[in-house]
């Protein structure tokens, strides 16, 4: 859950949490972590939800489907090979989760850092090329490797199919990004 949530937040530049993580005991407030500055602040404000029920709950996306339950291996480890399979049912649950993320009522320009780079209407008439230009860096970051032209074409054709059916650009890109977030290549498999 932590890895998926952090990966989605990093990929989309989310300014809110994907979903609540009650097992996350310590919570920081004040956005102290800024590695580009090379400095740590003199004071860090940290809350502990487990010990103080009145601690702030961070803002998060609304209406998110619960994270699919993994099979737990012996002794609490979740990295044993026989437990790391991805069944069709689990993949379907991840697809539902990813679609609920991009269709959240507060998934918009205020909460999504890459909104203008990915979801906003392009300022060009060559929409097909704009889709490819937007998806290439997103796919490379999501899949952590250089992507092939065939992969780029597959995802850009998917987005274009929505546009041909009369769907607006933002909705088409949301559906495509939802597919990226549900791809086994995004799950570190």
Regions found by a protein language model. Name each.
Residues 1-189:
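Low-complexity, glycine/serine/threonine/alanine-rich intrinsically disordered linker
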């Amino acid at each position: 859950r932590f890895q998926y949530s952090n990966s989605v937040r990093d990929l989309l530049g989310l300014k809110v949490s994907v979903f609540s993580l009650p097992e996350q005991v310590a919570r920081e407030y004040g956005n102290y972590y800024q590695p580009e500055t090379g400095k740590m602040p003199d004071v860090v404000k940290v809350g502990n939800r487990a010990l103080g029920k009145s601690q702030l709950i961070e803002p998060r996306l609304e209406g998110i489907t619960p994270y699919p339950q993994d099979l737990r291996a012996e002794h609490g480890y979740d990295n044993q090979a026989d437990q790391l399979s991805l069944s069709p049912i689990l993949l379907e649950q991840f697809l539902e989760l990813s679609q609920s993320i991009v269709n959240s009522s507060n998934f918009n320009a205020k909460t999504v850092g890459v909104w203008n780079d990915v979801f906003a209407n392009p300022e060009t008439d060559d929409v097909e090329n704009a889709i490819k230009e937007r998806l290439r860096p997103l796919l490379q970051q999501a899949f952590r490797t250089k992507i092939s032209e065939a992969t780029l074409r597959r995802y850009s054709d998917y987005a274009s199919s929505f546009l041909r059916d009369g769907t607006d650009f933002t909705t088409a890109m949301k559906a495509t990004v939802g597919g990226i977030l549900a791809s086994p290549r995004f799950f570190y498999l």
